[in-house]
Amino acid sequence: MNILHSTLSTWRDRLAPVSRTSTFRNTGQITPEEFVLAGDYLVYKFPSWSWADASNPAKRVSYLPPGKQFLVTRGVPCHRRLNDNFAGDAGHDDELVRDMLSGGTGGVDDDGWLRTGGGQDSADRQENRIKDVRTVDESGNMGEREEEEDEIPDMEDEDDDEEAIIRDPASGTTQPTRTYNLYITYSNFYRTPRLYMSGYLSPSEPLPPHLMMEDVVGDYKDKTVTLEDFPWYDGNVKMASVHPCRHASVMKTLLDRADAALKLRREKLKQAQSDPSKAPSVGESGLEGLVDDIKALSLSDQQQHGSDKSGGDEWEVLQHDEEEQVAIRVDQYLVVFLKFIASVTPGIEHDFTMGV
């Protein structure tokens, strides 16, 4: 059954009409040309990623150039397994993370993303999370949030925290380190990137496919993440894959939030011109920090502008007309994509792939 599903998925991607019209800002989808642009940026900025070709010309897709069929990074560490205490009670009713901007409710699956830790105790956990929400006052200042030891970090709350993706295992619970090769392909049917991953127990010992699910959050196993044949290789190479059916809606939500955060930051900067005490702090946490980091990157403009930095010395600051400035450009798409994919496999150190 799984073989049939993989085959149908591959042919659906290859036979679907190819879109050449950019709808990036409105839908979260990208065209093949935009995928190549975003891939070029990822490779340029983070050299651990590289372009790769299909194993033979017959495996190539026509809408991507030879030599740029997919992106790959190798040897990404994974230091621990995810158990039920981490993932919650898999197998109960699924819950969706709704777009917090629109406050969507019930009914429509396509506008959300499976929330980790579903199950009979989800109401209690949700109540605890509600207590943890930080407010923003009229001046754009974020309220204080109490830190809890057992809280699973969220990318929006811990963007600059080195432990945002993975925390060190507790003493006495050391587990063998696995490594993963990560592959980013383009789904022509869904018009979004798609992630595949292949695990290894050692450099010469592949991880059996079913054991890869030990590194996937429980509620995503066999739902959002399934075992699929990698279409660009001969020999039916089985990998774990994050299904792209909701990638566009999640990316659209992140784009909208980033634009809202950028607008808020502009307002705070304007206020700072008359009152310096209201100036945004350097390295501000949350999605505003993500906006500050990502909007400073460009593949086409390699010249540093002055000594002003944002989000790290390796990210150049660009000059934009204020009216035309956007929080996240299409060439930065894959950086944000990898940040939300990390929520599916938090044990895999995705930030390791972004070392320069």
UniProtKB/Swiss-Prot annotation:
Record keywords, A-Z = Autophagy, Cytoplasm, Protein transport, Transport, Ubl conjugation pathway
Q: Where is the composition biased (Basic and acidic residues)?
A: 122-137
Q: How does it assemble?
A: Monomer. Interacts with atg8 through an intermediate thioester bond through the C-terminal Gly of atg8. Also interacts with the 40 amino acid C-terminal region of the E1-like atg7 enzyme. Also interacts with the atg12-atg5 conjugate.
Q: What does this protein do?
A: E2 conjugating enzyme required for the cytoplasm to vacuole transport (Cvt) and autophagy. Required for selective autophagic degradation of the nucleus (nucleophagy) as well as for mitophagy which contributes to regulate mitochondrial quantity and quality by eliminating the mitochondria to a basal level to fulfill cellular energy requirements and preventing excess ROS production. Responsible for the E2-like covalent binding of phosphatidylethanolamine to the C-terminal Gly of atg8.
Stretches with biased composition (Acidic residues): 145-160
Q: What is known of its domains?
A: The N-terminal region is involved in phosphatidylethanolamine-binding and is required for atg8-PE conjugation. The flexible region (FR) is required for atg7-binding.
Record's family?
A: Belongs to the ATG3 family.
Species of the source: Aspergillus oryzae (strain ATCC 42149 / RIB 40)
Instruction: Provide the residue span(s) of the region labelled Flexible region.
Output: 85-174
Protein's UniProt keywords contain Cell membrane:
no
Q: Does the keyword RNA-binding apply?
A: no
Q: One GO cellular component from the entry?
A: phagophore assembly site
Q: What is its main location?
A: cytoplasm
User: Which region ranges are annotated with the description Handle region?
Assistant: 249-332
Q: Which residues form the active site?
A: 245
Offer one example of a GO biological process linked to this entry: protein targeting to membrane
| Disordered: annotated segments | 108-160
> Origin, by domain of life?
Eukaryota
The record's GO molecular-function terms, alphabetically, read: Atg8-family ligase activity
Compartment list: Cytoplasm
Full protein name: Autophagy-related protein 3
What's a Pfam family in this record?
Answer: Autophagy_act_C
